[in-house]
């Protein structure tokens, strides 16, 4: 990715910022999804998949940066420590570059259109998240599908499309569910930090569940998340016990399990050798 930025970005100051952004990235799970789907469907062009994988990681990084700038959190990130105008321009360059690189992997018009469709779907999901649009479990799941599901579907679907030249609806279906699972995991981890969606009263699955106030612990937790001085005094074990008493943890686990079962059911319909299906599942579910 750093080599691509060096080659494509002529403005040295802008390049320096982008290189710093990339250096902060320590995982490449979306590139792995693209690569393993490409290989599972017998892709052979090493250069093409390398371009797609690099472009995908640049795209994911740009969306992560946009998310931080919009939510004004993750203060320790390098892009949050510089002038917001510089950060915004730099991330726009990163996003544009990512699209350009991915589209170079294949010259088929439909390939580029699918990439843009996934990106636009995620942006629309992000808008619903920013304005706190979801008011029910169903609308929240739809928002998650658009925001997170589309970004997870992109590497899986495009990896297969690069290998076969065709859009694969089954791959799209289970990869959206994978995105929902990942977001549920993120929401769960966020329950244990003060600067989380609860403080902003974001209508996440967990917050919507608590708002139903099924028991006294739910009411207590809703109040607790609005009192920073009390929240920081509670240890993780006690907080986890309260979340369990309120039923939040069980609820999120059930939702995650439902997505996992859908993934396994869809993957069983793939016309792949068993070892390839198992390999894909092991890459997706860790």
Task: List the predicted regions and their residue ranges.
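N-terminal amphipathic/basic leader segments beginning at the initiator methionine
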Residues: 1-4
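Mg2+-dependent prenyl diphosphate-binding active-site environment of isoprenoid biosynthetic enzymes
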Residues: 7-219
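Intrinsically disordered, low-complexity segments enriched in Gly and acidic/Ser/Thr residues
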Residues: 219-221, 231-234
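Residue-level signal for secondary-structure boundary elements
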Residues: 123, 127-130, 183, 233, ...
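Catalytic cores of Mg2+-dependent Asp-rich isoprenoid enzymes
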Residues: 14, 18-39, 204-209, 237-241, ...
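A short structural micro-motif
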Residues: 121, 181, 227-231, 262, ...
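Gly/Pro-rich interdomain helix-loop hinge
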Residues: 216-226, 241-242, 251
């Amino acid at each position: 990715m750093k080599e691509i930025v060096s080659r494509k970005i002529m403005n040295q100051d802008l390049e320096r910022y982008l290189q710093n952004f990339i250096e902060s990235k320590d995982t490449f799970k979306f590139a792995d999804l693209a690569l393993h789907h490409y290989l599972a469907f017998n892709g052979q062009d090493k250069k093409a998949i390398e371009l797609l994988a690099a472009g995908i990681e640049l795209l994911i990084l740009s969306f992560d940066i946009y998310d931080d700038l919009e939510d004004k959190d993750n203060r320790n990130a390098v892009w949050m420590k510089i002038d917001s105008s510089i950060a915004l321009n730099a991330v726009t360059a990163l996003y544009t570059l990512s699209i350009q690189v991915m589209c170079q992997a294949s010259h088929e018009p439909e390939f580029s259109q699918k990439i843009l469709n996934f990106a636009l779907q995620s942006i629309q999901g992000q808008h619903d998240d920013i304005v706190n649009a979801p008011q029910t479990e169903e609308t929240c799941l739809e928002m998650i599908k658009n925001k997170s599901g589309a970004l997870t579907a992109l590497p899986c679907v495009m990896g297969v499309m690069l290998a076969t030249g065709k859009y694969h609806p089954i791959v799209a279906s289970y990869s959206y569910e994978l995105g929902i699972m990942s977001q549920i995991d993120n929401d769960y981890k966020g329950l244990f930090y003060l600067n989380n969606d609860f403080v902003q009263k974001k209508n996440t699955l967990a917050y919507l569940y608590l708002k139903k106030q099924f028991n006294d612990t739910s009411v207590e937790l809703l109040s607790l998340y609005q009192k920073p001085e009390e929240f920081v005094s509670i240890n993780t074990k006690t907080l986890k016990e309260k979340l369990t008493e309120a039923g939040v943890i069980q609820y999120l686990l059930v939702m995650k399990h439902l997505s996992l079962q859908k993934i396994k059911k869809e993957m069983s319909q793939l016309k792949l050798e068993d070892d390839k299906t198992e390999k894909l599942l092991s890459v997706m579910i860790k």
